[in-house]
UniProtKB/Swiss-Prot annotation:
Protein name as annotated: Uncharacterized protein UL61
Biased composition (Basic residues): 173-195
Record's compositionally biased regions (Low complexity): 235-244, 317-342
Region: Disordered, residue numbers: 17-66, 81-415
Compositional bias (Basic and acidic residues): 91-106
Length: 431
């Protein structure tokens, strides 16, 4: 219902230009009335100017959320010549046939013998019968042809055309327990873990002295069991534990040779992580390094909104970088973003809904895509992020290392790989 109401409002509302509030763009042609058909645009789009993006069509709206498509036009201030997504409703109306009248033979109208409830008298509005469901405890007398059958397994007499009910089950009613997972034998269990070499006898897999297996995958030597996150140090160099970054090492990060992981006694989860903001931090939760557009996280940005309009296809289609004409008739130029969006470029719409603000796709991808609207520059996850405002923790707490202040800012950086979402609430106004 709400969607219907909103769409109706949206479709019926046309932006009008109040000459007092919106001065036309200095180089814009006089405002044309809304009904003059224009070349260009998409599928009978609302009139823009030929060089503009036409109407964005919200077929990229996610799920139920209708996208309000704002094709920002080349000439226009926000109110002038811009179209605020009448797209969806109209499109939907074009694509879907009108609802068909209900077939009188449907089950609702059918009599009780065909599984329906027969034609019911319309209850007076507001009566309690509207809300109450018919009780299911009493069997419908039409279903049984004779007196109820004696309490024996076997089909009940049923009116022809209906399937007889299955015989009542004679099994006891307790639930079968699911079999538990097979427990590994004790000997096998003992073979894992730090003292694996003592398990089993000589000649068994993993048994005997580790030196006997040197050079094989079992010859990893006596190990220091590693605290969580470290890799236990093998005192016998085997093929698995060659020098960090060497051919046999299991680490795949490009910086492995420069940045050996933590010593076994040190409890820093994972390998050595590059500091936040270094160009090597490729993790999506951190500063992705210069020039990499932020990947919008899950909470930031619902649907990505509609596509921006496709460039107009009229005879006056502007070449990129040139305007058809300036008001005085001289050919004009597009001097950059200060002149409004680039010619022929509709901007993506905004998603509507709880998590509005997807990164709208534009028709022609700009050189540096702007991150989605929910993120200001410098917020977590965008290039230019300095760090989170952290509480000053004494010692350790949870899995925080003690924060190290960053010179020049009053900020401390979290040094552990918890996802950014955890800190999102701590973000303060100056970031």
């Amino acid at each position: 219902l709400w969607r219907g109401v909103l769409t109706t409002i949206e479709v019926s509302w046309r932006p009008t230009v109040d000459p007092e509030r919106f001065r036309p763009h200095p180089t814009s042609p006089p405002h044309r009335p809304a009904h003059t058909p224009q070349p260009g645009g998409v599928r009978g789009a609302d009139p823009g100017w030929a060089a503009d993006g036409g109407r964005g069509v919200g077929d990229h709206a996610q799920g139920q959320q209708a996208a309000t498509v704002r094709a920002e036009f080349f000439w226009g201030a926000a109110g002038e010549g811009s179209v605020t997504g009448q797209a969806n409703a109209q499109d939907k109306a074009d694509r879907e046939p009108a609802a068909r009248p209900r077939d009188p033979r449907s089950r609702l109208a059918a009599g009780p013998s065909r599984g329906g409830r027969g034609a019911q008298p319309e209850p007076p509005r507001g009566s309690r019968r509207e809300t109450r469901k018919p009780s299911r405890s009493t069997p419908l007398p039409e279903l049984l042809t004779g007196p109820p059958a004696p309490n024996l397994p076997g089909p009940i007499a049923v009116e022809p055309g209906r399937r007889p009910s299955p015989p009542p089950s004679t099994r006891p009613t307790y639930r079968r327990r699911r079999p538990t997972a097979a427990t590994p034998s004790r000997k096998k269990k003992a073979r894992r873990g730090p003292k694996a070499s003592k398990a089993g006898r000589e000649g068994e897999l993993g048994g005997g002295s580790p030196v006997a297996h040197r050079g094989t995958s079992l010859g990893t030597g006596v190990r220091d069991p590693a605290p969580r996150g470290g890799r236990g140090r093998a005192r016998t160099p085997g093929p698995v534990h060659s020098a960090a970054g060497g051919p046999g090492s299991r680490r795949r990060s490009p910086g492995a040779a420069r940045d050996p992981g933590p010593e076994p006694g040190e409890e820093r989860g994972g390998g050595g992580k590059p500091p936040l903001g270094s160009p090597r931090a490729t993790d999506g939760n951190r500063d992705p390094g210069a020039g990499v557009p932020a990947r919008p996280g899950r909470r930031m940005g619902g649907s990505s909104g509609g596509r921006g309009g496709t460039p107009g296809r009229g005879p006056e289609r502007a070449a990129p970088g040139a305007r058809p004409t300036a008001p005085d008739g001289a050919p004009g130029r597009w001097d950059g973003p200060a002149d409004g969006p680039a010619p022929g470029l509709g901007r993506g719409g905004w998603g509507v809904g709880r998590e509005a603000g997807g990164s709208g796709r534009s028709v022609r991808t700009a050189a540096r895509p702007e991150p989605c609207r929910g993120l200001r520059r410098g917020a977590a996850g965008t290039p230019g992020f300095i760090g989170f405002q952290m509480p000053r923790l004494g010692g350790r707490s949870g899995n925080f290392p003690p924060p190290r202040p960053m010179p020049g800012t009053g900020l401390a950086l979290p040094r552990c790989g918890r996802p950014v979402e955890k800190y999102r609430r701590m973000r303060t106004a100056h970031i």
